[in-house]
């Protein structure tokens, strides 16, 4: 694996060369929760990969040949095949690469995890809206009430299942797909939103012990530094906390 701590490529940069045989490339951004999903799966399945970080405020022109809207993550293999949308990319990795399957083999259990993901679907947008409101000094009481309700819905799932993780007694795909937003609650200033959800707090504690989660954890001070620059529209935000030469 390479690229975890490489600087972002921006406008005017040269496109990277072909993807080497036996490696998959991910176009990513260190602080992006959607990229985080896919990187968790890459790490959990020990897939050989390289990371190309993209400056999302100053995107290279060539990157639009990888994704029509210039979003991350995007996977690219040595056959020049491109896969984007984070959930689709994660499922592709699970289907194509050997090792422990993160999605269940059983069709019903797989469908059930996708239904759980639908129950989660409002959390990313509500988290983002709360973050923006807090950073801009606006009242976010109603937004936090709405976010707490969505988290209560997830709490009820864990209570009903009486399991440590959303997919059962061991980590599976659904846990990795929702984790990035829970990791960000503290740095977003929203940690109190799980004060009323004891099962979710136990799940969070269990997730923090997972090797893939630990490997991709970003220090809170670095994340806060990124957010400070990001909300100043500073294109250097995406490289905050890195040192050394740009790797292209």
UniProtKB/Swiss-Prot annotation:
Pfam families: GST_C_3, GST_N_2
DNA damage is among the record's keywords: no
Active site residues of this protein: 32
GO molecular function terms noted in the UniProt entry: glutathione dehydrogenase (ascorbate) activity; glutathione transferase activity; identical protein binding; methylarsonate reductase activity; oxidoreductase activity
SUPFAM superfamilies found in the cross-reference section: GST C-terminal domain-like, Thioredoxin-like
Keyword Transferase on entry: yes
InterPro entries the record matches: Glutathione-S-Trfase_C-like, Glutathione-S-Trfase_C_sf, Glutathione_S-Trfase, Glutathione_S-Trfase_N, GST_C, GST_omega, GST_Omega/HSP26, Thioredoxin-like_sf
Residue span, GST C-terminal domain: 106-231
Residues bound to glutathione: 59, 72, 85-86
UniProt keyword annotations, A-Z: Oxidoreductase, Transferase
Transmembrane region(s): none
This enzyme's EC code(s): 2.5.1.18, 1.8.5.1, 1.20.4.2
Gene Ontology biological process terms, A to Z: cellular response to arsenic-containing substance; glutathione metabolic process; L-ascorbic acid metabolic process; xenobiotic metabolic process
Annotated GST N-terminal domain residues: 22-101
GO CC aspect terms: cytoplasm
Gene3D superfamilies, per the entry: 1.20.1050.10, Glutaredoxin
CDD domains associated with the record: GST_C_Omega (cd03184), GST_N_Omega (cd03055)
Catalytic activity: RX + glutathione = an S-substituted glutathione + a halide anion + H(+); L-dehydroascorbate + 2 glutathione = glutathione disulfide + L-ascorbate; methylarsonate + 2 glutathione + H(+) = methylarsonous acid + glutathione disulfide + H2O
Family: Belongs to the GST superfamily. Omega family.
Cited function: Exhibits glutathione-dependent thiol transferase activity. Has high dehydroascorbate reductase activity and may contribute to the recycling of ascorbic acid. Participates in the biotransformation of inorganic arsenic and reduces monomethylarsonic acid (MMA).
Protein name: Glutathione S-transferase omega-2
């Amino acid at each position: 694996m390479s690229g975890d701590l490489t600087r972002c490529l921006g406008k005017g940069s040269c496109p990277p060369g072909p993807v080497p045989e036996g490696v998959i490339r991910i176009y990513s951004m260190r602080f992006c929760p959607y990229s985080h999903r896919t990187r968790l799966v890459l790490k959990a399945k020990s897939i050989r990969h390289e990371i190309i970080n993209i400056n999302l405020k100053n995107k290279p022109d060539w990157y639009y040949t990888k994704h029509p809207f210039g979003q991350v993550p995007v996977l690219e293999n040595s056959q020049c095949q491109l896969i984007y949308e984070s959930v689709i990319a994660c499922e592709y990795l699970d289907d194509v690469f050997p090792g422990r399957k993160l999605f269940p083999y059983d069709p019903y259990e797989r469908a059930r995890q996708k239904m759980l993901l639908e129950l989660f679907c409002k959390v990313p947008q509500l988290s983002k809206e709360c973050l923006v409101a807090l950073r801009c000094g606006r009242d976010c009481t109603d937004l936090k009430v709405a976010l707490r309700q969505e988290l209560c819905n997830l709490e009820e799932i864990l209570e009903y299942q009486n399991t440590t993780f959303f997919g059962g007694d061991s980590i599976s795909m659904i846990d990795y797909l929702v984790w990035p937003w829970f990791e960000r609650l503290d740095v977003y200033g929203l940690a109190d939103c799980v004060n009323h959800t004891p099962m979710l707090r136990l799940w969070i504690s269990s997730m923090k012990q997972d090797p893939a989660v630990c490997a991709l954890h970003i220090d809170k001070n670095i994340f806060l530094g990124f957010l400070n620059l990001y909300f100043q529209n500073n294109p250097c935000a995406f490289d905050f906390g890195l040192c050394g030469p740009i790797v292209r």
